[in-house]
């Protein structure tokens, strides 16, 4: 059983590192000249990772694509919040995390994460599960972009049953929600945790299909909007809305909490934060403006794949 456990870790790791390579190449192609800078890190007796960060690009103001493979004698609290019965178990975890903060305010910020855990006190019967998904955070809304994003997500999910997309879309809407602001972080996407309801091979296949669908979902949006004209007003609104991203990641994000509780590399954990951000107390958008439309038409729960969008 120990060999089977290690085979799972190896198989998932090979896929995630390959996906990291593909994602970085695709974004570097959009940039033209800027490149991701790689940092290899290790945690003594705890694993390590491969952090790739692109800064001050023409299209991407800051973006990170990170891979990590870590292990320990006890799962951090963030990993056992929903399952206290496995608290104290030894574990191994692998994950790929991506956050892209574009320069142009008309290009949405995007996040993706794919992770695998295996834990147990008994080597003969370890617990394993997958988690992850992807979500989109626009600053200026375009109906066609939102529909494209969700239709690609649905197409990937539908191979595993028609109930999967609505379930994981609803979970995404629930998770990426700022309770203290009473608003969602963006227009959502997919989110799932503790996925082990199928056999390992099928669960892993689901992860691979989602991972492979990410560029299809996001790149056309980036390509269509990266040269959209903008001015100081749009840039200031982008920086203001980025504040919500910071608030969510520091207050609610379980991945951030897991990394900090585990004692991972802080710079890699916090690469999700935007490089520039502003807060404006009591700010309200001008009625009828593009900024107001974001709140009225996009930062609401919607069925983006239906004809009406209701």
UniProtKB/Swiss-Prot annotation:
Positions annotated to bind a divalent metal cation: 101, 111, 150, 180
Keyword Oxidoreductase: yes
GO CC field: cytoplasm
UniProt xrefs under Gene3D superfamilies: Coproporphyrinogen III oxidase, aerobic
UniProt site (Important for dimerization): 180
Domain of life: Bacteria
InterPro entries in the cross-refs: Coprogen_oxidase_aer, Coprogen_oxidase_aer_sf, Coprogen_oxidase_CS
Subcellular location(s) per record: Cytoplasm
GO terms of biological process kind: protoporphyrinogen IX biosynthetic process
SUPFAM superfamilies: Coproporphyrinogen III oxidase (SSF102886)
Main location: cytoplasm
Active site: residue positions: 111 (proton donor)
PANTHER family: COPROPORPHYRINOGEN III OXIDASE, MITOCHONDRIAL, OXYGEN-DEPENDENT COPROPORPHYRINOGEN-III OXIDASE, MITOCHONDRIAL
UniProt record similarity statement: Belongs to the aerobic coproporphyrinogen-III oxidase family.
Subunit structure: Homodimer.
Protein's UniProt name: Oxygen-dependent coproporphyrinogen-III oxidase
Organism from which the protein derives: Coxiella burnetii (strain RSA 331 / Henzerling II)
């Amino acid at each position: 059983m120990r060999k089977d456990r290690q085979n799972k870790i190896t198989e998932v790791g090979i896929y995630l590192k390959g996906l990291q390579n593909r994602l970085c190449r695709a974004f570097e192609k959009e940039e033209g000249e800027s490149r991701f800078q790689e940092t290899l890190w290790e945690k003594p007796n705890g694993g390590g990772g491969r952090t790739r960060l692109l800064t001050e690009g023409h299209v991407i103001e800051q973006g990170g694509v990170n891979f990590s493979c870590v292990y320990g004698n006890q799962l951090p609290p963030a990993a056992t919040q929903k399952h206290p019965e496995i608290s104290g178990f030894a574990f191994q975890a692998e994950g790929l995390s991506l956050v892209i903060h574009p320069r142009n305010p008309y290009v949405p910020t995007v996040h993706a994460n794919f992770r695998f855990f295996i834990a147990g006190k008994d080597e003969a019967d370890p617990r394993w599960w997958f988690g992850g998904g992807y979500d989109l955070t626009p600053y200026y809304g375009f109906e066609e972009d939102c529909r494209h994003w969700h239709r690609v997500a649905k197409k990937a999910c539908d191979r595993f049953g028609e109930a999967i997309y609505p379930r994981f879309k609803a979970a995404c809407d629930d998770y990426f929600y700022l309770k203290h602001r009473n608003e969602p972080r963006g227009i959502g996407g997919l989110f799932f945790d503790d996925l082990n309801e199928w056999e390992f091979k099928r669960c892993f296949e689901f992860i691979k299909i989602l991972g492979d669908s990410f560029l299809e979902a996001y790149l056309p949006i980036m390509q269509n909007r990266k040269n959209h004209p903008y001015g100081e007003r749009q840039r200031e609104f982008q920086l203001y809305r980025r504040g919500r991203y910071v608030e969510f990641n520091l207050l609610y994000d379980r991945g951030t909490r897991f990394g900090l509780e585990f004692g991972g590399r802080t710079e890699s954990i916090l690469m999700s934060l935007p490089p520039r951000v502003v807060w404006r107390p009591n700010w309200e958008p001008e009625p009828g403006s593009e900024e107001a439309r974001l709140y009225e038409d996009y930062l609401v729960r919607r069925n983006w794949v239906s004809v009406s969008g209701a």
